[in-house]
């Protein structure tokens, strides 16, 4: 018999319909469901695929470096980072007429180019790269790493090199190696790079392999380290009139705690960042020696979990049984990893604009907006994925006997209380926030703006004041000049920090008012509702009062036949599917808020945000409509301009988004009838009837159509907003 796709499932391979193709694609990565899979082979396959993932990442980043070196303007951008536009790569497009060629020839290039809004120029400049040759070297090195990863992946699939199951289940050793090796050693190496290459480069000293061993990063070398006078490394830092990349105003310190920003670059002090990475390295190198392996010293995680019984007996048997539950479930581990990574990605978004680490990136407004939005959306997808795999854990891996009366079992036992509390919080936030917005909207419409309900966010302002913001007049903690906290940090990082917090040209602790209060609660509504749907999906994944035997149907069942009413749309997959819409809309509100607040800040008219953000029409008219004018102008009677590509993408994004509804709102029977009619016509048309299907065409299943609809909705939604964001920001600020 011929081998048909999918090889991993003989049952599917013999399916006579097009279902074979779609179900084959859908389950290609669900190794657990493949024929002849064993637990050991499952772990080995996943392990080997990680090397493939690394190879792709290294190849991609290598491509970034290569194209900028080949077609970019890195060397001229360095001369004037604030006025030269960084080029990502050239555009070769046979459709371009003369107006298009002229519109896209920018940044000192000879032909049409794309402008880089990713921040790579600022990053490479900050870490000490200075020439195109440096970029080519980096690209080649990453290409080498990519090849190495592919070889490693292939190697670990060979019989002699396949790790055993016991190796994968050795949690303590893996933790030690990841904490010490991944985090500890890499942070130490990065500190080394910053101290030996980046900091000298910021002071006009060019360190490469040829002079690496000759140039001392600090005049006294290792002397202060060996004699215990570590404070010497912080003495004589760069002055406030230091010109980045030159010796003018430069100091000699390498590990400092200055606080605040470098006045010229508006970014964190490089010497502060080196100090930070050294501290991180120190912590993780110690943490990586915490767990007991074959040396018989350190903690055994299992012993820790078993020994800890919560006081008062209110949490049952505490953490007993958790070690094996987590260690034997790949989905539990993936869920934990995704939850952590999702939070970290969102934190990256929040911190990259408020505490910018890269030189001059704070003054590149479009890049700031693009990076914030990018990281928030990525975080949203990763976080929803955490709950998806949590639900799969409950269905495939959870063993009630093993977890009797421990914290995990008790979560399931009182899931009704958890879900109903989340539901109450969502309803409260939703009705009150919408009520305020609608009330204010009506007052504006009736011409009585003074009757709006405007609430000052006094608690948030108090927190900002505690961190040193003096605008609001709260005399508290760091904004109080006679408190112990103020006096303790006065000789160290505090002056730099306070200067940064109270200088209104950056994004650190922006002044907030009633508009912020309202949108904050709108976002809280979105977060709580998304969480409600995800948590309910995971906690009800094994069964509910309506369908106690749900776990027997797997993760993504459509219904249990026509005879059981109410079993449609209640699989854990359906909860994930619904939550993604809420996630996208919530991040929509987050990014609208961030972008509008910053546009008005950068343009110097913050009153526009303050006055218009308290009612719905303000958001629709003064943010969305007003800022889409650049897009609508991408093509006009006078020809085209450099925003045309975004105008086209804006339209195309709407098209993709709207296509999603074709899959989401019409059901399977309609498509099945349509397909049968088309097949009939096909078979009776000359020439067309010479081509026959090997598989009988059938409509997508309900679950598959939802997935396709969701994919189009998500992609269209993000494309549309990306075009809007980049065009409206770059159109204003060049």
From Swiss-Prot:
Gene Ontology MF terms in the entry: 4 iron, 4 sulfur cluster binding; chlorophyll binding; electron transfer activity; magnesium ion binding; oxidoreductase activity
Binding-site residues for chlorophyll a B1, renumbered to this chain: 654
EC class: oxidoreductase
Annotated localization: Plastid, Chloroplast thylakoid membrane
Binding site for chlorophyll a B3: 662, 670
Membrane topology annotation: Multi-pass membrane protein
Keyword field: 4Fe-4S, Chlorophyll, Chloroplast, Chromophore, Electron transport, Iron, Iron-sulfur, Magnesium, Membrane, Metal-binding, Oxidoreductase, Photosynthesis, Photosystem I, Plastid, Thylakoid, Transmembrane, Transmembrane helix, Transport
Reaction catalyzed: reduced [plastocyanin] + hnu + oxidized [2Fe-2S]-[ferredoxin] = oxidized [plastocyanin] + reduced [2Fe-2S]-[ferredoxin]
Regions that span the bilayer: 46-69, 135-158, 175-199, 273-291, 330-353, 369-395, 417-439, 517-535, 575-596, 643-665, 707-727
Keyword Ribonucleoprotein appears in the UniProt entry: no
EC number: 1.97.1.12
GO cellular component term of the entry, any: photosystem I
Chief location category: plastid
One Pfam family in the UniProt entry: PsaA_PsaB
InterPro entries listed in its UniProt record: PSI_PsaA/B (IPR001280), PSI_PsaA/B_CS (IPR020586), PSI_PsaA/B_sf (IPR036408), PSI_PsaB (IPR006244)
Subunit field text: The PsaA/B heterodimer binds the P700 chlorophyll special pair and subsequent electron acceptors. PSI consists of a core antenna complex that captures photons, and an electron transfer chain that converts photonic excitation into a charge separation. The eukaryotic PSI reaction center is composed of at least 11 subunits.
Family: Belongs to the PsaA/PsaB family.
Name of the protein this chain belongs to: Photosystem I P700 chlorophyll a apoprotein A2
